[in-house]
Amino acid sequence: MSKMASSIFATFSLLSSLLPTSLASSDANYEDFLQCLDLYSQNSIPVYTRNTSSYTSILESTIKNLVFLSPTTPKPNFIVTPMQESHVQTSVICCRMHGLQMRIRSGGHDFEGLSYVSNVPFVVLDLIHLKTINVDIEENSAWVQTGATIGELYYRIAEKVGVHAFPAGLCPTVGVGGHISGAGYGVLMRKYGVSADHVIDARIVNVDGEILDRESMGEDLFWAIRGGGGASFGVILAWKIRLVPVPPTVTIFIVPKTLEEGATALLHKWQFIGDNVHEDLFIGLSMRSVIISPKGDKTILVSFIGLFLGGSDKLVQHMEQSFPELGVKPHDCIEMSWIKSTVVFGVFSNDASLSVLLDRKNPFPPKSYHKVKSDYVTEPLPISVLEGICHRFLKNGVNKAEIIMSPYGGRMNEISESEIAFPHRKGNLYKINYIAEWEEAGSMENHLSWIRELYRYMTPYVSKSPRSSYLNFKDIDLGQTKNGTATYSQAKAWGSKYFKNNFKRLMQVKTKVDPNNFFCNEQGIPPFSS
């Protein structure tokens, strides 16, 4: 940063305590906001107003949930797409100066739209251009900017060497900013834990417009942004991550079973196996309904999805010893490189090229109307409960619902609940993701009622005190406050579910680094009242 820029930011820091503590007055002078961006930046910052021809296309470009593309959805006053770190600093400064709330978007996969929707005057800070990835194989690490996608990260790692990986999710278009700050599940979780377990440094812009790294932010804030949701504390610019070793060959399998083929009994058996098999083996599953006749008759399809860090011969041996009922045979297994497996799981095609990982317009999964929820299971579900789930999936009018179950065990059981802000560790058998999708806006209420009724049905059979949820499967039904003005007791409604006993410490960190709650949203971490 030049001396002039440094002086500007220093001046702002001195004046920051004089800025208003509340956001978004109705008489905010938005022209002054644009002038502020020019004043505090030495080069032009891309900014789009509602009168800009490309405003709508940029706003909608990464929105995955069609629920938030309706004409009645509140739209930002401005979209800022920073090209460099100083643009982020300037944006924070000018939003604070001119009473505009900031929503921070990296990949646009926020299930509740909180990264790009607000009910007060606001700016979307779209980090899509901050996507540089520098891989250092000698150090087994990489710096990845927050606007990069998981697919891009995977591709750049494999470009350097074929026996390193990073434990993260399946969908290649998810942005690393939100994914890692919310924890980051994937098929390597039993071997290596979640993405946030492998963050060794970070760069963040704080409420005063300063860029901090791990040393300058301190260990409390560094702890909080690993699993606690970075958007409550600042703007994550980049993560330094530790890479993990993988063998040259991994093996995958996908074994589908219908109700008629004994899917319910196999699912029940899986509950006693998934968290106990060797940590090199991940066996997850997906449950959905499928139409099997022209008359619309349906059945349930349960797909058992496996990844093994090794060859198919050894995988088949493991399966014969631990889960012979599933009947995995050599012809069910496909050997490939780890990077190829990310393509297969990411787009469910064995024919797609590796370059699909770089395609931000990848149509899989397609944009849709959807609602999600999550649970953690600590005791195996009885057969009768699984049958009750199946019965609900066969309900008419709900054809695109899905449940995904991800097993625990292995490394997930070895890390303390308080090691990072993400708390869901030992004691869980598996995590459940519930997903309801629909194709027409008019079907929303039917599908919302369906998923909420299923969630209520599951109440006696999942984790308790609190009933836990996964932050990256954000669920506004857990509770919210408008404009991020929650008290401790209000925020505990969702905070205890996402963060368990770590919630109070997260609020303590928030109170220290952002006492006036500039970085806020409907389910953010609020500060303790002064």
Swiss-Prot record:
Pfam families: BBE, FAD_binding_4. SUPFAM superfamilies: FAD-binding/transporter-associated domain-like. One of its GO terms (molecular function) is FAD binding. Its EC number is 1.3.3.8. Binds 1 FAD per subunit in a bicovalent manner. Keywords: Disulfide bond, FAD, Flavoprotein, Glycoprotein, Nucleotide-binding, Oxidoreductase, Signal, Thioether bond. Disulfide bonds join 36-94. Belongs to the oxygen-dependent FAD-linked oxidoreductase family. This is Tetrahydroberberine oxidase.
